[in-house]
Design a protein with these regions (language model features):
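Conserved HGGG/HGGXW glycine-rich cap/lid loop of the alpha/beta-hydrolase fold
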Residues: 1-60
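Conserved acidic catalytic loop of the alpha/beta-hydrolase fold
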Residues: 68-87
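Residue in the alpha/beta-hydrolase core beta-strand immediately N-terminal to the catalytic nucleophile
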Residues: 86-89, 111-113
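Catalytic nucleophile loop
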Residues: 94-95, 257
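Flexible "cap/lid" loop of the alpha/beta hydrolase fold
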Residues: 96-142
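Conserved serine/cysteine hydrolase catalytic core
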Residues: 171-240, 249, 283-291, 296-308, ...
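Post-His helix in hydrolase/transferase enzymes
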Residues: 249-271, 282-288, 296
Length: 316
């Protein structure tokens, strides 16, 4: 845990994707200068999937790795004795786990930021391998294809080399294979978009506000669009970031943090909203893609003047 729970404010809960841990997945975002205001006012709990932390020892022979459902069920016992509610930020497998957690504990989750979320049950390994030029049994290569587009794999060599070395050297390979196996054999979330005035109270879907984030060249684009089609449109915004690949919280952190910052602020104290929304400023300057109208209507930004000036002056 980073910081301590403050009054009745929700705790920010993060969960990483396969091949990563909380450091490689979220350090760039939470260490970004303008995110420091968030970390000053909210406690942040970073969760690593079993055995995925750096330097983790291998599991004993015969160990049964938890399923995705079991990892979601493990969350309350790990931290909820100290907090009243959470705002979840998850990437890939972590976004799936936090979605399960929200479906099972709707009163505990105030909102979700889901990056590269896939609600479907189809195995990602076959899909990822099909994106490569030829079949490979190398787990690192398959995970790289899961995270990055073909263009990124060839054009952004510095980023690719950094993550390839991290996945291959910092994460225990046996433990990683077990985590990947659990994600590969996940079940469908079985969520569906409610029909207003007809089945809102009975349909299985996320009841909290959700911000779905994906880069426009990410391998996860189709999956995130599918997830968006299954959620309540009055509580969900799909943000497809322009000129961005598989890890928007890393490669476009100067823009991504604004949406995360704004979303968290709205959820924590909606009564303090101001009318100026910096996203209008960004869109007019051509720096950000236009998010859906739901974002402008439902989630304006707190202290918009200061955020807009910060972001406009940032060198991205």
């Amino acid at each position: 845990m980073r910081g301590v729970p403050k009054g009745n404010r929700p705790v920010i809960l993060t969960y990483h994707d396969i091949g990563l841990n909380h450091k490689s997945c979220f350090n760039t975002l939470f260490n970004y200068e303008d995110m420091q205001e968030i970390t000053q006012h909210f406690a942040v709990v970073h969760v690593d999937a079993p055995g995925q932390q750096e330097g983790a020892p291998p599991f004993p022979s015969g160990y049964r790795y938890p399923t995705m459902e079991e990892m979601a069920e493990m969350l309350p016992s790990r931290f909820l004795c100290r907090v009243n509610s959470v705002i979840g930020i998850g990437v890939g497998a972590g976004a799936y786990i936090l979605s399960l957690f929200a479906l099972n504990n709707p009163t505990l989750v105030e909102g979700l930021v889901l990056i590269n979320v896939d609600p479907c049950a189809e195995g990602w390994i076959d899909w990822a391998a099909s994106k490569l030029s030829g079949w490979t049994s190398n787990l690192v290569d398959i995970i790289m294809a899961h995270h990055f587009s073909t263009d990124e794999l060839t054009d952004n060599q510095e980023l690719i080399q950094t993550y390839r070395l991290h996945i291959a050297q910092d994460i225990n390979q046996d433990n990683l294979a077990l985590f990947c196996g659990s994600y590969q054999y996940r079940r469908d979330l079985e969520i569906e978009r409610p029909i207003v005035g007809l089945n809102e109270a009975t349909v299985n879907t996320l009841t909290c506000p959700a911000l779905l984030v994906v880069g426009d060249t990410s391998p996860a684009v189709e999956a995130v669009v599918e997830c968006n089609s299954r959620l309540n449109p009055t509580k969900t915004t799909l943000l497809k970031m322009a000129d961005c690949g598989g890890l928007p919280q890393v490669v476009q952190v100067c823009f991504c943090h604004l949406y995360v910052w704004s979303f968290i602020n709205f959820l924590s104290c909606p009564s303090s909203l101001l009318t100026l929304n910096p996203f209008y400023v960004f869109h007019s300057q051509g720096n950000l893609p236009r998010p859906s109208s739901t974002f402008f209507r439902e989630w304006p930004v707190l202290r918009g003047l200061s955020v807009a000036s910060k972001a406009t002056e940032s060198s991205c």
